[in-house]
């Protein structure tokens, strides 16, 4: 149950969203995907779900009862799909944290459902090479910053500290340049404009 906000006077405590971990990570082959990994992982070779779709709906409903939003960690496209399904069923909005690989249909669903995409551009630098190996068949659907903006999604840039450094200017640079070193831009068609990146960093 969320703290009551009905009592008068200043409050020194605020409640953030309910965080739900739906899958793992790409590098450990535990991000829950629609398609299998090259070497397989999990019962069907496509990663692992940390919570069932039914339990996810229950958790989001519990957040709704407590007047909380839900922030769901979803890196794989199957995980993101199940989170969007759960938001649709429960009728509340929240955010998907990471959203590293998405189907075309689900890119459009973010805006339709009012779901925020909370992404970390520096993960692109960390995962670029591994993505080309593990997700070579879907690399063009990874870190789809520009597609999400074009679809009307509320995009928020963050750091995911301490996994990546708290460096908003570095995140903005990667979001715009799609590289963190001297190599060419990685899928430059997904680059944000500087204005878009700054706006997303202020959310």
PLM feature spans:
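Metal-coordinating catalytic core of metallo-dependent amide/deamination hydrolases
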Residues: 1-77, 109-116, 121-122, 172
